Structure formats: C-alpha cells, structure tokens
Amino acid sequence: MNKITAIVLAAGSGSRMKNKTKKQFMEIKGKPVIWYSLFEFEKSRVDEIILVTGKEDIDYCKKEIVEKYNLKKIKNVVAGGSERYESVYNGLKEVTGNIVLIHDGARPLINNEIIERSIEGTIKSDACVVGVPVKDTIKRADKEGYIIDTPNRSELWITQTPQSFKTDLVKMAYKKMKEELEKGNTTLNITDDAMVMEEFTTNQVRFVQGDYKNIKVTTPEDIDIAELFIELDAK
C-alpha cells in the first residue's frame, strides 16, 4: 500500500507582483491563491500535506489557512529557505509517505486528474513531472537577441508541477545536491526538482500530461487569467 505525501511550496516573495501581499496569499474570487491547490490535495487520495512557507508566515498559515478552511490533511507547516531547493529540502524532512508530489502553491488550477496521473506515473516510473507540449515555435538566442537555433518543437514540453517521485530517490538526490553546494560548487543551476534527479541520479524522469490551464501565478495579469479559468470551469 502506497502512502502519498504532497509538499506544497508557498515560501516565495512574489516580487514580480508589485504588491505588498505575497502572491500565494493574494485572493482569487475571495480565497487565497494557496487555498486552491491545498483544497485539491485535501479532497484527493493524498494522505498528508506538508505546507512550506516563509518563517514569518507560519502562524498566519496555521490560523488563516489551515484552521480557517478546516484542512485536515496538513500534517505540518514548516519554514522554507531563501531558494526553492532549500524549501523542498526542508519539506522532504517531514515526509512519511513513500511517494511525494512537490507542487508550487502559486499554481492554483491543479485538478484531481493531474494529481492522479502524477501518482500513477510515479508508481510506474519512479519519477515524473507534469507538463504540456509547447504550441509555439521556440528559438534559442544569444545575449544580444540573435537567433542561435530552432529546437525541434515536437521534443519540447512546458514543465509544470506537481513533480512526483519515490521518496527515497528524491531524498537521496537532494542530499547529494546539498553536499555539492556545501563543497562550494557554484556551477549548479537547478530550477526544479526534475533537474535534481537528472543531475544526481541515474533515474530517468518521465512527463505525464498536465493542463494548459495549470498556470503559475507570477504577475498581476495571471490573477485575472486564473479567475477567468475558474469561472469557465464552474459553468
């Protein structure tokens, strides 16, 4: 029997929002952005949720998110770090499940279908990430804007979250990365969990189908887009 844990990351500062309220706590249709993904995990077959937030926001999350919305599956609210990988590492310390889904709390439009595909994909392949094929032609350019080349679009995916793994594998990968950083290796440019697996394990990471609506709320316009998608889904 698999035990499934979700880590929801909500420790970002949201500087691109140009708003005093952090993006994960801004409201969409009367509820904070972070609530939407927590609620989806709450009603899914996930067994426990670890919420990772800024140290200064722990009490707020406990009172205004967990207690206010009666979220029973949240096992703990823990402090994140200054970088995403530090927040994930802190969250992994609290995981008791053998499968873990790591999700950006700034992606409020996750749904149960995505969660199920993530779980089943991890059971079959040990490591998987949610994504969607790119629709546009993508080009690489140099610092001055001159085109270097045009990658084959059929091989390109937009990477989303959750990113899901057998817990022992991702813990091992993060441990190895932390050791490298402590040695002073500053050449690492890690932007998501799949990259940690790619860099520090021999396991292949597989894509599972996501949803083009599974956007990350980063700018003020994204709040409007998320509201529109929620309204359309309600019809």
What kind of region is each of these model predictions?
Residues 74-76, 82-141, 160:
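Conserved beta-loop-beta/alpha segment of the NTase-like Rossmann-fold superfamily
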Residues 17, 41, 61-65, 118, ...:
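Hydrophobic packing residues within well-ordered alpha-helices of enzyme cores
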Residues 8, 34, 91, 104, ...:
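Residue-level signal for inorganic ion chemistry
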Residues 35-97, 178-183:
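Conserved N-terminal catalytic core of the sugar/cofactor nucleotidyltransferase
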Residues 158-235:
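Conserved alpha/beta core of the MobA/IspD/sugar-nucleotide pyrophosphorylase nucleotidyltransferase superfamily
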